[in-house]
Amino acid sequence: MSDFIPPAMDQMRKNYSLGGLHENDAKSDPLVQFQSWFEEALEDVPNWFEPNAMTLSTSDVSGDITSRIVLLKGVEEKKFLFYTNYDSTKGSQMRANPRVSLCLFWPHCQRQVRIQGTVDKVSREMSETYFHSRPRDSQLGAHVSQQSSVIDSREAMESSLAQLKARYPEGTQIPLPENWGGYAVTPMSFEFWQGRPSRLHDRLVYKRDDADSNDWVMQRLSP
């Protein structure tokens, strides 16, 4: 079988010319720099785009890597928060190896941020607060989904949803599932990427040696 190559894929490219990233303009604290870029990403954002969508990469003890899109749900106490099913593939991999990578790409700004760090579960109280702020259908969906497990059919899943709706009618509180909640990523490195002409992009990386340290070292990387 021949390789699948869509027409002209090798010629698909954009010229990046919206701006630059210089050390003199970058914040000394990468969290402040992230906040600045995130706020700019919210400006003139296309209505189809979720600027808090990020790629979460995890790995198991054998070194196999899995990546997927999750939603950033907050930055609190200098940690990046997201929520998911603890029994999912990512949940089991993070139990085995708490080192993770996050990547946010904002094409309308021609920018990307990579974050590497370690992950811990948030408190059940924090998970409950967020869970009950979600739309009711999303709360029910968290109960129905046995994430990453094989299921017989979509119909079986929808039947389970109907049963849960009958069990928890409007006006009753839906409990937080035991296997669902939040994670907090403590960053150890950031890389801020700004697209530039001629593929000579700007890349500034911040690193620290200790999770309790506020002493970040900034360096420029070759594109």
From Swiss-Prot:
Annotated residues for binding of substrate: 13-16, 73, 130, 134, 138, 199-201
Top enzyme category: oxidoreductase
PROSITE patterns assigned: PYRIDOX_OXIDASE
Co-factor binding comment: Binds 1 FMN per subunit.
Catalytic reaction equation(s): pyridoxamine 5'-phosphate + O2 + H2O = pyridoxal 5'-phosphate + H2O2 + NH4(+); pyridoxine 5'-phosphate + O2 = pyridoxal 5'-phosphate + H2O2
GO MF annotations, alphabetized: FMN binding; pyridoxamine phosphate oxidase activity
Gene3D superfamilies per UniProt: Electron Transport, Fmn-binding Protein, Chain A
Pathway recorded for this protein: Cofactor metabolism; pyridoxal 5'-phosphate salvage; pyridoxal 5'-phosphate from pyridoxamine 5'-phosphate: step 1/1; Cofactor metabolism; pyridoxal 5'-phosphate salvage; pyridoxal 5'-phosphate from pyridoxine 5'-phosphate: step 1/1
Keyword Protein biosynthesis set for record: no
EC number: 1.4.3.5
Binding-site residues, FMN: 68-73, 83-84, 90, 112, 147-148, 193, 203
Cofactor(s), names only, from the UniProt record: FMN
Pfam families: PNP_phzG_C, PNPOx_N
Keyword Flavoprotein (UniProt): yes
GO biological process, one term: pyridoxine biosynthetic process
Record key words, sorted: Flavoprotein, FMN, Oxidoreductase, Pyridoxine biosynthesis
InterPro entries, per database record: Pyridox_Oxase, Pyridox_Oxase_CS, Pyridox_Oxase_N, Pyridoxamine_oxidase_dimer_C, Split_barrel_FMN-bd
Subunit structure: Homodimer.
NCBIfam families: pdxH, PRK05679.1
Family in the record: Belongs to the pyridoxamine 5'-phosphate oxidase family.
Role noted for this protein: Catalyzes the oxidation of either pyridoxine 5'-phosphate (PNP) or pyridoxamine 5'-phosphate (PMP) into pyridoxal 5'-phosphate (PLP).
Name this protein carries in UniProt: Pyridoxine/pyridoxamine 5'-phosphate oxidase
Record organism: Rhodopirellula baltica (strain DSM 10527 / NCIMB 13988 / SH1)
Lineage: Bacteria, Pseudomonadati, Planctomycetota, Planctomycetia, Pirellulales
